[in-house]
Amino acid sequence: MKENETLKQIVLKTLEESVNSLISSFPEVEKETFKIKIEYSRDEKFGDYSTSFALENSKLLKRNPIQVSKELVEILQKRTDLFEKVDFTPPGFVNFRISTSFLLNYIETSVLSGNYFPKVDLPLKINLEFVSANPTGPLNIVSARAAANGDTMASLLKAIGHNVDKEFYINDYGNQVFLLGVSTLVRIRELKGEEGTQQETTDDTPIEIILEKNILPAEGYRGEYIKDIASSLLKDPKKNVTIENLLKQKKYKELAELCAVWTIENNLIWQRKDLDAFGVEFDRYFSERTLHEADKVLSVMKDLEKSGKIFQEDGKKVFRSTEYGDDKDRVVVRDDGRPTYLLADIAYHKDKIERGYDKIYDIWGPDHHGYISRLSGAVQSLGYKKENFKVIISQQVNLLESGQKVKMSKRAGSFQTMSDLIGFLGKHGKDVGRYFFVMRSLDAPLDFDLDLAKDESDKNPVFYLQYAHARICSIFKEVGDQTSKEATAILEMSEERKRLLFWIARFPEEIFDSANAMEPHRVTNYLQSFAKAFTSFYLAKDNRLKDASKEVRLGLARICLAAKNVLAEGLKLIGVSAPERMEKEN
């Protein structure tokens, strides 16, 4: 057995060798044309793994799949060191049952030796950007989902040997940021006793009128947090003096720009505090403003023009994004010379490329799907390979309470924040929040059941896993933590014991496959199935360590230790704690 291989890789390699041996007697067949793959048996009674090789390749083989399967079984049955049983199921499936001795040896060299995760042959330098919420307010629930999944993806990729930088892009430039400053200024003037007006505005209302009459813009921010920020700015002696001076001089626009900077500073402090509470740390916070200040936004135009992907239309500079699947070509420089948001994004990704990343991954919100083709096209026009840039869309989150959706609205001020959610879930907010957000694939909407999340029984999937870990810890406290590899090898293998061994041995490949697919939800799916296998083992009478003979106890304890390691490491990857003691362990 080669170190750094998963059990699935070992079985697949053995199958490939057996197929090559089989078709060596078929000179008219080219082995390179074959599809050879294995999957987990859909029904455990048939085995641990299965392959439909004979069915999928019957035309190429020009032979009956039943006959091919039977011949393949004969070859595979010779590997008695690896397989306990290999058999055939019509109309052409070959099923594999891994031998107990092989499982035990594999577990010893992986889960019980600390070599949990196989490493990739070629480690990559990866940039993983996620959350990147506008600094115009607290982080919302969609950002929380991106945070949990992005952080878990980074952990998975690092676990298998990649070098990963986690990055947060700060959108601190542009009109929306200015409107944030205007919104804060309106609240400051109100707090100073200046009567504002409730006059309705539109997107076309001149900013001079909005500032002169102290009107909250139509696209402004109405949340209570804006009032809190305004109040805190007035309590700062230096800032208050600046505010007073600029108000007296009626330099409202200059003051609004300052308020935008100050408000963003406050919001970033809040956002980072929320992320810290959620166990998410970034390697880099990258400011969009720095790109503009370094003239990197307009200068990237030279690269795009060199690629021949820019044309002029009505005084505007337009990127040929339709060549990359976009529904229309996109303006990157307006007729007044101002860059669009797209050009800033292109400049940002050029900066990533120049930092030498082999792979660039972005996690975006649910309303950005149409943006992928234009940015991907721009990245390709800069000479970066299409396959090295990937955008993952984090779909919408629906909070459910008593089966009903809880509404969210950002600008109206009645939305649920990441901080609100963690607080609502109480002392277990971080663990429960992170786990629930990772439970479903990012490309599907998530119904976040608040009632289930608050439930501290084992109906809650987080507590189900944590109780399993705590049970094992309590077992060791009761009978001691001594184990024996030799005692495990001579244990009688009941169905529950053998099933648990296979689920333990699957841990490295589940993590390896989840990391390569960048699908964190596969980890939670595996852990739930694993915990069920452990619970069946735990409840079986012949697995009660305190009632067993010393030799049996030492063998069972070895299995429990491996199970404990799987639970602890699996939970750690998704940022969830593995407590040794909980109020309910039995």
Swiss-Prot record:
Domain of life: Bacteria
Major place of residence: cytoplasm
UniProt motif 'HIGH' region: location: 133-143
GO MF, any single term: ATP binding
InterPro entries per UniProt: Arg-tRNA-ligase, Arg-tRNA-synth_N, Arg-tRNA-synth_N_sf, ArgRS_core, DALR_anticod-bd, Rossmann-like_a/b/a_fold, tRNAsynth_Ia_anticodon-bd
Keywords annotated in UniProt: Aminoacyl-tRNA synthetase, ATP-binding, Cytoplasm, Ligase, Nucleotide-binding, Protein biosynthesis
Enzyme class: ligase
EC number, as in UniProt: 6.1.1.19
Keyword Aminoacyl-tRNA synthetase among record annotations: yes
Assigned protein family: Belongs to the class-I aminoacyl-tRNA synthetase family.
Quaternary data: Monomer.
Protein name: Arginine--tRNA ligase
Gene encoding the protein: argS
